[in-house]
Amino acid sequence: MLEKILRTIQEKICLQQYIMTLHAEEEMEDDDSSIYDIENGILTGEILERQKDQTSAESKYRIRGETVMGEGIEIIVKLGATAKVVIITVYALLGEEGGNEL
């Protein structure tokens, strides 16, 4: 099931059917990441876990992948009400190469 959700998220990223929260944009800037790093992280990544929002009961997904330079990055996303991917937050995995070694 998570593979199907990941493919859907990745397809929407390729079609640029996503939005970023202000928080995600701020975190991206703080980590000196670019939108290309975020997109690449999702496209090369895998879902580590599904989380449930306590208030809304919405599912969100923690994805670990690679930046364009091969560094580790994690992105929290959800599928929004408008059928776009909502990028909630992002964070660089400092000192970690590659995104899929667990």
Residue ranges of predicted features:
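Ribonuclease/tRNase effector modules and their secretory precursors
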Residues: 1-102
